[in-house]
Amino acid sequence: MENNKTSVDSKSIKTLETKILHGSKSMDSGISLDVSYKMDYPEMGLCIIINNKNFDKNTGMACRSGTDVDAANLRETFTNLKYEVRNKNDLTREEILELMHSVSKEDHSKRSSFICVLLSHGEEGKIFGTNGPVDLKKLTSFFRGDCCRTLTGKPKLFIIQACRGTELDCGIETDSGTEDDMACQKIPVEADFLYAYSTAPGYYSWRNSKDGSWFIQSLCAALKQYVHKLELMHILTRVNRKVAVEFESFSTDSTFHAKKQIPCIVSMLTKELYFYH
């Protein structure tokens, strides 16, 4: 157990008829042959790391000590996975939105996927620039299928290390497809996104001033260990387990002492994702 110092469906819509569209590639068993994302494009893709450590005084938000450790660890991890990593530090909310808009307008046609890591203060549905909050929905909307066509049908991963509220978890003891196919398919604009949150809705997310955040430490370790063996959702389940079991806060303030954390994965992926091919 880690003991280092830690910081802290719609009732108004009438029933509509639906139709089932059967895929063109299938087996007699009904299982689709095209179950995993194509990851053998010429490039793996971009990995944008936004690392906000220092904040304007008038925001009242503290310096995020230990976040540089996370940023360095993430850069090494995704560079080893052949991503083009771009680190950005201490961005305002306007700069974050400008960056995301700019990246979404790039040509991703030769890229397999897209990753964005957000390291900052936060609250439910928001991430903080150095001068104030940004709605996550607005930030990620630039990459929807109808906005960023060269990433349509490709996995878009958002990794978010930030608080989602002020609740504290005290814990409890326990016993124990082809390109031709894609051209004729219509998919939801919100498809193929995955959000990996460091903590559950409403809760604090813990960070160690020396070793970095519990979530990013665990994520990087799991990727290094399992990336050539397991599918992404299986890897993230290992991350959940590691954070839940191996970490606990240590503080001289009893309010914040012996607290736990569980990451939260929200997936709209439509296929399995293997980083190897």
Curated annotation (Swiss-Prot):
Lineage start: Eukaryota, Metazoa, Chordata, Craniata, Vertebrata
UniProt activity-regulation remark: Inhibited by BIRC6; following inhibition of BIRC6-caspase binding by DIABLO/SMAC, BIRC6 is subjected to caspase cleavage, leading to an increase in active caspases.
Superkingdom assignment: Eukaryota
Stored Pfam families: Peptidase_C14 (PF00656)
Propeptide segments, given as residue ranges: 1-9, 10-28
Residues carrying N6-acetyllysine: 11
Protein name: Caspase-3
Gene: CASP3
Reactions listed under catalytic activity: Strict requirement for an Asp residue at positions P1 and P4. It has a preferred cleavage sequence of Asp-Xaa-Xaa-Asp-|- with a hydrophobic amino-acid residue at P2 and a hydrophilic amino-acid residue at P3, although Val or Ala are also accepted at this position
Entry GO CC: cytoplasm; death-inducing signaling complex; nucleus
Primary site of residence: cytoplasm
Free-text description of this protein's post-translational modifications in UniProt: Cleavage by granzyme B, caspase-6, caspase-8 and caspase-10 generates the two active subunits. Additional processing of the propeptides is likely due to the autocatalytic activity of the activated protease. Active heterodimers between the small subunit of caspase-7 protease and the large subunit of caspase-3 also occur and vice versa.
Subunit record text: Heterotetramer that consists of two anti-parallel arranged heterodimers, each one formed by a 17 kDa (p17) and a 12 kDa (p12) subunit. Interacts with BIRC6/bruce.
Residues bearing PTM Phosphoserine: 26
Localization in the cell: Cytoplasm
GO biological process: apoptotic process; erythrocyte differentiation; execution phase of apoptosis; keratinocyte differentiation; neuron differentiation; positive regulation of amyloid-beta formation; positive regulation of neuron apoptotic process; proteolysis
Record PTM N-acetylmethionine, positions in chain: 1
InterPro entries per the UniProt record, alphabetical: Caspase-like_dom_sf, Caspase_cys_AS, Caspase_his_AS, Pept_C14, Pept_C14_caspase, Pept_C14_p10, Pept_C14_p20, Pept_C14A
Active site: 121, 163
UniProt family annotation: Belongs to the peptidase C14A family.
MF GO annotations: cysteine-type endopeptidase activity; endopeptidase activity; enzyme activator activity
Function summary: Involved in the activation cascade of caspases responsible for apoptosis execution. At the onset of apoptosis, it proteolytically cleaves poly(ADP-ribose) polymerase PARP1 at a '216-Asp-|-Gly-217' bond. Cleaves and activates sterol regulatory element binding proteins (SREBPs) between the basic helix-loop-helix leucine zipper domain and the membrane attachment domain. Cleaves and activates caspase-6, -7 and -9 (CASP6, CASP7 and CASP9, respectively). Cleaves and inactivates interleukin-18 (IL18). Triggers cell adhesion in sympathetic neurons through RET cleavage.
Residues bearing PTM S-nitrosocysteine: 163
